Amino acid sequence: MRVESLVEMATRYIEELIVTGELKPGEQIKEDDIAGTLDISRPPVREALNGLEGEGLVVRKPRRGAFVIEMTEKDIWEIYTLKAELYATALNYAMDRITNAQILELKDLVAQMKANAETKEEKILAFQRLHREFHIKIMTIAGNQRLLKMAASLHKQIRRYSFQTLGYDAHLTASNQFHQRIVDLIEQKDREQACKMMRDHVLDAMTFLLSHPDIFNDCAPEPAKKQKINNEP
């Protein structure tokens, strides 16, 4: 088993701070603090920040340091609409190649997602991981590596918003149902409806996000408290 490098460890740690909201959009990422927490030197942290900047999660400001990138509604719209087309295109390609065994693998991932469909931080992170595996599986079957890389980049840029939206039962349930319907349509070999459902799934997530400014502005409550808010009139 390959040992995780210091740069990879720092990258994973910083990304999780951003995703879970411990580091807010516009907040400075202090190299000394990260290095101290991980008990490593600053160069690996600096290299990790360079990588995260390239992935669109961090921005560097001259003589000021690194900051969590801030997004506008236009940024969100651009990312989600592009993501919807990439995911639908991947599924369209995959429909020509997918096997019954691979459909069973997708079903298993959906079952695991359902088992983790709870508004607790550790469950949301598990749901996110399974969600990503589901779409990576489809893109791998599609056989287009460039498409896979583009989608992975977009996923990272909006992962923190995905984490926040999945803290609401309504959206968590809807996401799980979308994936179940997509697998059912794949099994039925209904290419047109499967691709449409894939687009609808991504665009539904965008609509939910933009209709909840508390999430978009990173002022949303902790996942464990969101159920109560979701039930308010």
Residue ranges and their predicted role:
Residues G167-H171:
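Solvent-exposed loop and edge beta-strand segments that line ligand/cofactor-binding
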Residues R97-Q164, A174-L185, E192-T207:
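Conserved amphipathic alpha-helical segments that form helical-bundle/coiled-coil interaction surfaces
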